[in-house]
Structure formats: C-alpha cells, structure tokens
Amino acid sequence: MSARKSTIISMSVGLLLAVVAAPTAIAGESEPVSISLVYMADLHAQLEPHAEFFWHGGEDETATAGGVARIATAIEAIRRERPGRVLFMDAGDTIQGSAAAAWTEGKAVVAPVNALKLGLAIPGNWEVVYGAKVLVERAGEFRHPTIAANLRDAKSKKLVFPPYLVKEVGGVRIGVIGFTDPDVPERQPPSYSKGLAFDGAGVLPTLIDELRRKEKVDVVVLLTHVGLPKSIRLAETLKGVDFVLSGDTHERTYEPIVRGETWVVEPGSFGSFLGRLDFTVKGGKVADRKWELIELRADRFAEDPLVKRVVDETLAPMRPKLAEVIGHTQAPLMRYNVVETSLDDVLSDALREAAGTEIGLSNGFRFSPPTAAGPIRESDLWDWYPISTRLKVGKVKGRQLRAFWERELEHVFASDPEKLFGGWVPRPSGMTVRFAAHAPEGRLVREIRVGGEPLEEEREYTLVACEREGDEPDKLCRIPHVREPRVLGLDAHEAVRQYLARHSPLSAPEGERVVAVDLPSVVRSQVFPTPEGRAVRAGGK
C-alpha cells in the first residue's frame, strides 16, 4: 500500500475517532427514554423498486417492494414518530449487486444512500469487490461513518476504520461495534481483498469492556456481517452485548432470537425490509424490547419523491443499456432456496453449453431479487452476476468431485456455525447430487451422477465454472489440482446472453439436480425450522 493511501486511512480513522463523544452522565436515570434502532442489510445496490418474493405466514406471494426512495419514506415516518431518538444503520453489502454499481465501482450507490441520512455502517463481504482503494474511497464519500473492529491494513496492521462508535441518541449513550466477515480472503476471489487483513471474534471482548467501563455506554450493539448462525454464536459467547444486528445471510427474522440477555435479528435483503428495534432505557438498563421486521411493500409505503429524483438522476445515463431486452422467460426465475434454484439452473446450463463441458457449476449466491416472467433485460443479468468473470475449464477426477461436494455441503449445513462458509449450495448442470443434511461431517453425500451415470472415482470429467481472480492456476471453483486448466475468452455474461438468444422463451427448469433426502424440496433458511418442524443443521439450538 502506498504511503499516501496509508496516510488517508490513518486520517480517516483519526477523524472518526475524534467524533466519538466523550463520556457523559448516564441518561434516562429519572425517566425512561424510548429509543428505536433501525437498520438494513444486504441492499446489494438495489436502488429501485423490484419484484420481491414473500412467504411468511404460509402463503407464497410476489409483490413490488423496496427501492431507496421507499426506504426513505419508512425511515422518515419512524423519525417523525420518535424525533431525536432514532439511530439508522447499515450492516453492509451495499455497493455491489447491480449493473449500476458494477459499472461505476459502487459510486452510483453513494448519492441515493446518502439521501437516507444513515447514522453509521459496516462493510460487508462484497464491499471489497472493487479493491481496497475503492473500498476506502466509497466509505469516504458516504456522509455517515464506517466502522469495523476487525479490518486492517495488511502492511501497517492499522485498523482501516474505527472499531466502534458511540452515539448519543435521546440522551442515551449507545455504543456500536462493527464486525465484518473475517473469511473474506478465502470466500471472495483473493485479489479483491489484496492489501487487507481480517481479525476474528477475539477482538470483541476487549472492545465491549471498553465501551462499558471507559465510554460508560447504556447500550452495546454489535453490528455484524457474518451471517445469522455466527451472530447467534457470538450472542451465546460474548458478555455485555444487548443486541446483535446481523447481516450477510439475507435471513428474515420476524421474531427475535434470544440468547440470555442478548437479542439477535436479521432484516432480509435488497431494500425490501427494514428492521426496527424499540426499547426503553432507565438508569442505564435496557427494558421493554420490541422487534419488528417491516416489509417495504409498494402498497404500504410510497416512494419519497425527492429521494426518487436522486435515484433517477443517478441512473439516467445508464437506462438505455439497463433496459435492453436480452431474452424472455415464461416462469419467474428466483434465488430463494438454499438447495437449488430455478435461476441458477439456467445459469449453470448456460455456462456448460458455452464451454462444451460435461459439468457446469455456478456459485450458491444469495443476491438478486426475483426476475418476473416476461422480458429479461440487461439489468437482470447484472443482478444475477454482478461481476464480469471469464469462464475457466479443466479436468477433475470423480473423487475430487465427491470431496468438493462433501466440503461444500458441510459449509452450508454444519451444526457448528464456525464451519459455515460462503453462500448456499453450489448449482450444477450435467450433474445430480443426493445428500443427507443431518449426516455426520464427511458422510453427507449419498449419490452423485454425471450425465445420468453413477460417478466413477478415477474417471476424469470436464468442468466449467467462473474464474476466481487470484486463485492458483490449477484451482477451479475451489477444487484444487485440476488438470489442464484453461481460461476461456468468453465471460459469464456473454455465455448467458448467447444461451438466452438460443433458448428464449425459457420454461421452468425441471429441478431436482440437488436433493436433500432429509429436508423438504424448498429450504428458505439455514437457521429456522423447516415447515415439517425439523431444523436445518445450522440452526443450532
């Protein structure tokens, strides 16, 4: 890292730490003070209203929701209800996830999000997508501070952002610690986080104690981007935390998860939801807690006209390209199943057809709102794949494929949250997998077939996936020691465009490429019980 960049980072930390208020007398000693913590997570640069899929209450429904202008309406209503007693936060994965974000390295998100008047934010695992320099630049362009207790400059070892912020809200001192995903260097392509280093949860106890003893806060909040299962584990192991506000796994917690005196929540994704925590503070004690997951449906919240204008002005130069029709689908394409999705069946088919291999693999991404039946536009393609990566092919033996699936399934369904890693189950084409989610580690896979035939352990198979920039040359989709690896001149976007041109209108994929023998066909969550009442292994207690 250059001396200039190191200086900029050090200055940003110093300035923000200077903003942290000095200790004052504990507020609310005589009369209880009502406070609202409101937050969003995993916006993924979805600036405009979009189709959203709702399933809470037992009925599946698709409705228009979200958009930054609709978020603005909702948060302003809460601010009017509790003037001066609202803290609005963002739990990360904000500047990645759409064409507008990708084409501007996240800059298109800045003005619309600034219009929301956030109090603070943390970086998510995708904030590194444009590199460390851009991460710091975008954080500096937002009007709210960014905090992260475990993100360091790899060379200087100094924190990139302050570890915490103390905000006085309605006379109540609230200490917020930021904690981002320490798995980023392995989870994302290695080049994304070059120049950065990440610490684990061991940094947190000292900071909690510092907030309580030195800063004399009334409330301690842990704002995380490590996913709900790991956030629950943090609540179980850390002392002195009142609320863990989780992001990353896009989970929708309609009821709080309670661990001792700590509440854990997560507010969905894509700007389709806001999470609201109401509580009172008297004599430095938190009481009367209430959680609400607010669905930002179009029929419940109008768009704020001033913020809508900001979004329109931001997107205006890109609209012709965003609106280009590149295909059609007769059925909705969605990414709302932990095990298999209609959208990713299409994408893995497109990669395999473009490369002419026996097997295609697409990552188990969580991002992208639903694509409704009808025209498929360029904007949809960038929601599906918000980064442009070339295709990479190679040869792998059957035993390598089996080891890959054992490892990937354990990353999704491990009973120990610390073993969870990345997104959802990988999405195959030309291959089917049957597994038991509740089986012991290393024995999850029941059957693998390629081209309809049982997997042969020593046979070589041809495989295509997206290149991960910074990986070893012989690694393909996290499979090491691949033979004859080769990067194609074709990227994933063009592969999908060509596939849509040949196969539109798309019909609903047949599915059942990946089947859990001990789970229902649709699994919406890695945490909550299934409709049959059986908990997915990652659900913990």
Which residues fall in each region the model found?
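Bacterial N-terminal signal peptides that target proteins for export
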Residues: 2-12
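Bacterial N-terminal signal peptides
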Residues: 10-21
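Acidic, metal/ion-coordinating pockets
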Residues: 27-309, 316, 338-350, 360, ...
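Feature captures C-terminal
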Residues: 31-36, 46, 143-150, 155, ...
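Glycine- and acidic
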Residues: 53-58, 190-192, 330-336, 386-390, ...
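Short amphipathic
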Residues: 290-293, 325-330, 393-395
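Acidic, glycine-rich low-complexity/disordered segments
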Residues: 312-323
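Glycine-rich phosphate/diphosphate-binding loops and the adjacent beta-loop-alpha structural elements
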Residues: 321-342
